[in-house]
Amino acid sequence: SQHGLSMQDMRTVSRLLHAIGDFERIGDHALNLQESAKELHEKQLTFSTIAREEVDVLTSLLEDLLNSALRSFQSDDPQMARQVEPLEETMDLLTEEIRSRHIRRLQSGQCTIQLGSILNDLLNNAERVGDHCSNIAVSVIEEQEKQAASHAYLHSLKKNDEFSFQLQQNLSRYVL
């Protein structure tokens, strides 16, 4: 076309291209998670009961985080998108706590370095999926509110009472 894209259309295309990149990265991290599971299976390794319980909580959170980001993107719903960042922050806090607990188990001989390496890979990939979900949700909010300052948005969001409330709700739901 001789007329090209309007500014609004260019913003939409840019948002969609960024989201495609985030979805691709999520797929890459999903493959990494699959590789970790395959390694556990092939080497007949098992986490301790407590580590399995922690991974189960993390998996539940990861599913909710992915579903919230995907639903907000599919429906272009900024309200739904606002639920993603508290979930992502919960992911960060949970992975940090699981790492601390793992180090204590390692120090006390309850876990091996090999299992710890796999657990660390799981945690890193889960965190990165959370980051990409956050990017997707922020893009939905930016599109609806016609703003493009995602860092400023995330900074102001974390000072918001609703964010704090949702974060506390999440922390009581995803208990290690």
Provide a role label for each language-model segment.
Residues 1-176:
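Cytosolic, long alpha-helical scaffolding segments
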